[in-house]
Amino acid sequence: MDLPDVTAVQHESRQLALASSAAELHGGLCGWLSGGGADSADWLARILADSGQVAPRQGGALDQLRQATVAQLEDRDFAFELLLVEDGAPLPARTDALFDWCRAFLGGFGLAAQQRPALSEEGEEALQDLARLAQASSDDFDTADEDDTALAEIEEFVRVAVLLLHGDCVMGPRFRQRLN
């Protein structure tokens, strides 16, 4: 299932008077789900830690974002994608969106996992690496082609790290429960 268009997510986010970008919303949602948080229509209230937050309109871009994200995280073909910025955005905007995504992921993951979850050694490393990325900024990149390639590699690393953490916190326990 494909993610909704980033512009549609931004538009609906503005309609709900949210200060978060599409990248931050997706990062927070992915963190929430990867940390074992429930897939529910009121996901915004959960990741924003605001019980007064209205649930997204059913069938709207934010609801589609939740549904597609759940489907992608559960996909056995590892079809998970990051929702960052519009295609063709300048390198600084893309790097800032990725680092914002990582910060939001960590927040959502922490809210869902609450106490430190049992992670594999690789999961621990992935979480630490995501924390380092969350501290970075676009100032760490130039506009050179090498930086464009480096950003693509970092995006792929983040994608794999998220799948690994989701596997440790959600898929692994679910599989072990089925065995018992």
UniProtKB/Swiss-Prot annotation:
Please name the SUPFAM superfamilies in this protein's record.
YgfB-like
Gene Ontology cellular component list: cytosol
Q: Tell me its family.
A: Belongs to the UPF0149 family.
By its UniProt entry, which NCBIfam families does this protein fall under? PRK04758.1
Please give the HAMAP family that the UniProt record associates with this protein: UPF0149
**Name of the molecule in the record:** UPF0149 protein XAC3406
Report the InterPro entries cross-referenced here.
YgfB-like, YgfB-like_sf
